[in-house]
Structure formats: structure tokens, C-alpha cells
């Protein structure tokens, strides 16, 4: 008899889009941890930053080491795109870990993904 846990092991890899829209360090840290777990299981993961989510770098701490999670995610081939308008509204420049994108990029991530998670 198959258990629920063994059924999960048979799931094919998927494309996962994660939308970060807030600035709460713990929530963003957990979203990034999930993204890294999914990447480790062979899934393709992309993150779109919108609203306060574009400020995620500013909320790094010893307890919630967001920078470490981001480095791990990018090193594994993950993609991060930030809403360019949201960056502009906050007078924040794009960076290697927060590159500017457009609504077209957000739409592409959603339409090409098997699952979309929002945090």
C-alpha cells in the first residue's frame, strides 16, 4: 500500500512562481526557504517582487538570514524579478538580487507556471 508521503515522491518536477508582496522578514525568509527546497527537488522556481516585496533585502537579520537564502536560490539557478514601477515608487534602484521587470514578466511567470504561491 502506498502512503501519502510516497505519493509525493512520485510527483514530476514543476514550474513554481512565488510572489512576494510584503516586507515581513519571517514570511519572506520562509518563502525563500520553500523556493530553495523546491529547487533542490528539481523544480524550476521564479520569484516576482511586488509592492513592499521589492524591499526584501532591507529586512535581513541574524534570525532571518534572507541574503543567505537569496544567494542559495540564485546559485541554484532561480530567477528573481522585481516590479520596476514598485522600485521607482520607493526610489530604489534595481540590483543583481532585485532586477527590474514589468507586468509582462509577472504575467509570463503566472501563465507559464504550474503553481503560483503568494506571500
Q: Where are the language model's segments positioned?
A:
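Short, Lys/Arg-enriched N-terminal segments with co-localized hydrophobic residues
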Residues: 1-13
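Histidine-anchored nucleotide/phosphate-binding helix
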Residues: 27-42, 47
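Charged helix-capping and loop-helix junction motifs
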Residues: 32-33, 62-67, 99-102
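C-terminal structural segments of small proteins and small subunits
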Residues: 88-119
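Short, well-ordered alpha-helix to beta-strand connector turns
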Residues: 42, 77, 113-114
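A glycine-rich helix N-cap at a beta->alpha junction
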Residues: 63-89
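Short, glycine-rich nucleotide/cofactor-binding loops
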Residues: 16-29, 54-61
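Short internal beta-strands
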Residues: 35, 45-51, 80-84
